[in-house]
Amino acid sequence: MLNSQRQLWHSIILATALAIAGCRVALAQGTTLQITVQNHQFSPSELRAPANTPIVIVIKNNDATPMEFESVSLRVEKIIAAKGQGVVRVRTLSPGRYEFFDDFNQGSRGALIVQ
């Protein structure tokens, strides 16, 4: 009997720990934004996100050439293959305007507005 109670408590503790870990993962995912590159232009060219929340930017490159999503202020740099998709994870940010560009095509520019 004592052994089965111990196993039950171990199971409850394990289930609770896994549930808490799952909640942390869900909270850490934050805001997901999507942007498309077509004809070497970002669409939309301005993204908006809440402050103090992790941000995930999904970039879909519809062009026939690769592109490099880059931002000095966001501290990110990601090469995305032609007709490919990439994901950039950004730390929590204070309110402000954070510019990004395609390093392979300097005319392609956009901004992340954090409020």
Question: What residues fall within each predicted segment?
Answer:
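Short beta-strand/loop motifs in extracellular/secreted proteins, especially
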Residues: 55, 65-67, 110
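Asparagine-centered strand-capping/turn motif at beta-strand->loop junctions
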Residues: 59-61
